[in-house]
Design a protein with these regions (language model features):
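A generic structural signal for short
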Residues: 32, 61-62, 115-116, 148, ...
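N-terminal helical cap/lid subdomain that shapes the substrate entry/recognition surface
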Residues: 8-22, 27-106, 125
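Asp-based, Mg2+/Mn2+-dependent phosphohydrolase catalytic module
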Residues: 1-17, 110, 123-124, 128-239
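Short glycine/proline-enriched coil/turn segments at helix->beta-strand junctions
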Residues: 78-81, 112-116, 190-193
Length: 239
């Protein structure tokens, strides 16, 4: 796969960034780890048990809510008035042993100047577990999780605006790394640089459309299928 589909600014166009915001799942680790497949399965199991419906219908609801509301949890909260905590605890009770330590990625993230944040639609507990297993947790100033966002998920604009306000971020100095292209639209509108980290996990219709792209959408400034290589190519001010 090529590094980019279109003529875009060189990676060193990010050299002045001082806030580095990373999505978690399928961004900081490769989708081939199949970690999110565990979460995906447990979502269906939880819905089937809590709503008392057959598993195939539970899976249908899971995917339908994901597409309609941004996350399955948002749909369960809005349609079924379900409390979020039991869902988050259950779906994130997974085996992290499949995750490798990533010393090369650690090296590249560690050299990024300024602040580093994780911004996830998952729980803080999940993010801490994953980043810890990867050997990256101590590199990040904070984790902005779904609870911190008032259970408003990406790509909702309110989630991004809340994160920016909470952490005092100047959007013009920030860059967002994401595997979901729709989650980069608002960062672009807010004035952030955006990087699509391409994933082999394509569970959303918008991701499926990526297969037919002949050029990158305007809201995606850079794309890569190798985060270590991309970060390693940055010419960083003060480094």
């Amino acid at each position: 796969m090529s590094q980019s589909l279109a003529e875009k600014p060189k990676p060193n166009a990010l050299e002045a960034c001082r806030v580095w915001i990373f999505d978690l799942d399928n961004t900081l680790y490769p989708a081939e780890c199949n970690l999110f497949a565990q979460v995906d399965q447990r979502m269906g199991d939880f819905i089937a048990k809590e709503l008392g419906v057959p598993h195939p219908y539970a899976r249908h609801l899971q995917k339908s809510y994901y597409r309609q509301f941004g996350t399955t949890l948002s749909g369960l909260m809005q349609v079924h008035k379900m409390a979020p905590e039991p869902f988050l605890d259950y779906v994130h009770d997974i085996d992290l042993s499949v995750l490798p330590e990533v010393p090369e990625l650690r090296r590249e993230i560690a050299r990024l100047p300024g602040r580093r944040l994780i911004f996830t639609n998952g729980s803080r507990r999940h993010a801490e577990g994953v980043a810890g297993k990867l050997g990256l947790l101590d590199l990040f100033e904070d984790i902005c999780d779904i609870t911190a966002c008032g259970f408003i998920p990406k790509p909702d604009r309110r989630a991004f605006e809340g994160m920016v306000a909470r952490h005092g971020i100047a959007s013009s100095e920030a860059v967002m790394f994401e595997d979901m292209p729709q989650n980069l639209e608002v960062p672009h509108e807010l004035g952030m640089a955006t990087v699509l980290v391409r994933s082999t996990y394509m569970d959303h219709p918008i991701q499926q459309k990526m297969k037919s792209w002949t050029s990158l959408p305007a809201h995606i400034h850079h794309d890569t299928d190798d985060l270590v290589r991309f970060l390693g190519g940055l010419e960083l001010v003060g480094k």
